[in-house]
Amino acid sequence: MTQEYDNKRPVLVLQNEALYPQRRSYTSEDEAWKSFLENPLTAATKAMMSINGDEDSAAALGLLYDYYKVPRERRSSAVKPEGEHPEPEHSKRNSIPNVTEQPLISAGENRVQVLKNVPFNIVLPHSNQLGIDKRGHLTAPDTTVTVSIATMPTHSIKTEIQPHGFAVGIPPAVYHSEPTERVVVFDRSLSTDQFSSGTQPPNAQRRTPDSTFSETFKEGVQEVFFPSELSLRMPGMNSEDYVFDNVSGNNFEYTLEASKSLRQKQGDSTMTYLNKGQFYPVTLKEGSSNEGIHHPISKVRSVIMVVFAEDKSREDQLRHWKYWHSRQHTAKQRCIDIADYKESFNTISNIEEIAYNAISFTWDINDEAKVFISVNCLSTDFSSQKGVKGLPLNIQIDTYSYNNRSNKPVHRAYCQIKVFCDKGAERKIRDEERKQSKRKVSDVKVQLLPSHKRTDITVFKPFLDLDTQPVLFIPDVHFTNLQRGSHVLSLPSEELEGEGSVLKRGPFGTEDDFGVPPPAKLTRTEEPKRVLLYVRKESEEVFDALMLKTPSLKGLMEAISDKYDVPHDKIGKIFKKCKKGILVNMDDNIVKHYSNEDTFQLQIEEAGGSYKLTLTEI
């Protein structure tokens, strides 16, 4: 049986070539088929086909030839049932007849009606291997149309369409013993302009089936749809069809869980009180009106930073940050820190300390993100003058979208803070509550927030200016290792496309992370840092200022030798005694980073022709 079907050839195979020339349109079926069947199907032709084992092929061609020899008027009147209303002929051709409809054509029992000028493939039943071999020669082999012209098999015939991911098969109601199946074949290389009602002549409109595609076919492949299943036609979803492809910048909401000032004036920003070095939770979420919708593109990167509230030039801001850093006990002291709480790491990833005053991380807008941050600088730490009002500070959050191909954030918000030391925030709140309770309502000139309405949650205020880029601070002491300076924040979207470990690297990355091209290799000339010490002997009350020419142990020896007439070559050891009583050997690192403008009591001891110096911290 298998050998018998292997010897049979297909009746008609037209390859679906992408460059196949467009055939001219015919106004009638008779003209189309008669132009195709130019030579009559003689008995000799049938005999030759029978000798080659193509009885079915000869029968099929005879069916088609005899069918189109019948006049058009007789065919139209013969296929119309008497009990139905007359309807346009194109609806007859594009629908599968019911079981009760009987064909009245004497030339044969099977009919295959195909849209004119559309390539298609016809193969014999059970010749799956033959169909596979021929599909390998087609230009667009992702769709194969199989039409049975013999007795309808009892199993399901399916046409798999790989690009759409579903199979289109003959409906179960069509499986009956009467082999009267008709299949409508569409060529996807046709555009919707060819099917529009405004550009087609009346005759072409009458023969054209409705299409559920709203856009031009994009692939030159075939698709098969039965009339009852045309509703299954679904265009592929492109990136522009996503519900949430581009992140909207107006739907983000950030909150800080900290105490707010009770003395809020109308129109002013909310003042939040923080304790220096204490961690406070910051919550980030996307407050879209379409709640419950899962956004397919949902990763964003946010940068939390401490910035100055007042408008200052970039040079002034860097000068204030450098002064603050020079007053710290360690060069690694940061302006803002993030806690490694498990609650935080479950909602964020890719945490990077991109600067001393900024931290960036990635989070999913489908979920709520929470981070714990601490601020390590006071408002009064930026000036050497005592008793002056400190500089106001802001916590600012910039959010960048994955699809944002620029350095401009999609959303920016801030809240004004005032940082206290040693639980000063709680004392400030209690002091305001006490003053508010003593003040009479009639004497109040500014509207105060009632104490019973006070909450510990501050909502960040949106900032409309998205063009001004904040200043990132990176101390000069790290230039020798990192070869980078303080510059303006610039986060490219390429950084958002990958996710690494929780702490991707630490505390800094490469120049590419900031969107700044690597600088040319120039010799960096920077002035040596000067160190000033205040020293006095135990018997003295006034301090002497020791200015070290070089911030090193050798520079300290030279300064002491010049000031106290101690021979430089006879100085043996120099010790530093901390306030805790710890005695350590003085070295270059301590002199350079931990001794500037500190006060010491100097003790000089002579033993064995050498001097031992001890600097006791006061």
From Swiss-Prot:
Residues 76-100 are annotated as: Disordered. Residues 1-91 are annotated as: Transcription activation. The keyword Nucleotide-binding does not apply. Residues 248-474 form the Grh/CP2 DB domain. GO terms for cellular component: nucleoplasm; nucleus. Methylation at Arg-9 and Lys-116 may be involved in regulating transcriptional activation. Keywords: Activator, Developmental protein, DNA-binding, Nucleus, Phosphoprotein, Transcription, Transcription regulation. Residues 380-389, 427-430 are annotated as: Interaction with DNA. It is found in: Nucleus. InterPro entries: CP2 (IPR007604), TF_CP2-like (IPR040167). Disruption phenotype: Mutants are healthy and fertile, but display an initial delay in coat growth, with older mice exhibiting hair loss as a result of poor anchoring or the hair shaft in the follicle. They show reduced numbers of abnormal desmosomes in the interfollicular epidermis. Develop palmoplantar keratoderma. They also exhibit mild chronic skin barrier defects with altered keratinocyte terminal differentiation, increased expression of inflammatory markers and infiltration of the skin by immune cells. The modification Phosphothreonine is found at residue 208. One of its GO terms (molecular function) is transcription cis-regulatory region binding. Residues 76-92 have a biased composition (Basic and acidic residues). Binds DNA as homodimer. Homodimer, also forms heterodimers with GRHL2 or GRHL3. Transcription factor involved in epithelial development. Binds directly to the consensus DNA sequence 5'-AACCGGTT-3'. Important regulator of DSG1 in the context of hair anchorage and epidermal differentiation, participates in the maintenance of the skin barrier. There is no genetic interaction with GRHL3, nor functional cooperativity due to diverse target gene selectivity during epithelia development. May play a role in regulating glucose homeostasis and insulin signaling. Belongs to the grh/CP2 family. Grainyhead subfamily. This is Grainyhead-like protein 1 homolog. It comes from Mus musculus.
